[in-house]
Amino acid sequence: MGVSYIPVARADELTPGGMKEVDLGGRQVLLAFVGGKYFAFSRQCPHEEADLKTAGQLLDGGKIRCNNHSYCYDLSSGECTLPKGAAPLTVLPAEERGEEICIRLEW
């Protein structure tokens, strides 16, 4: 299995509680900095495809709520925590490497 780290932002571009849209090969991904951790996830809510850039609200504990219908997702696992059992959010591993934030891709 191979691993690549794709730089998507500089570490100083995100403030605590902030989100930034990044393009990952034509796919729109959001990058967030919550609780000292970086998270990368799909821009679209899996419930009804709301744009989480505008409808999403970052919550303590590394979660995001889609304000259209109050669905909540864990940004580490993608699990829908409210309501339980709904379709998960697509998440990608993100980490700080030097002065850059990178998304880790495995194949």
Label the model's feature ranges.
Residues 19-107:
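Rieske [2Fe-2S] iron-sulfur-binding domain
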Residues 1-23:
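Zn-dependent metallo-beta-lactamase
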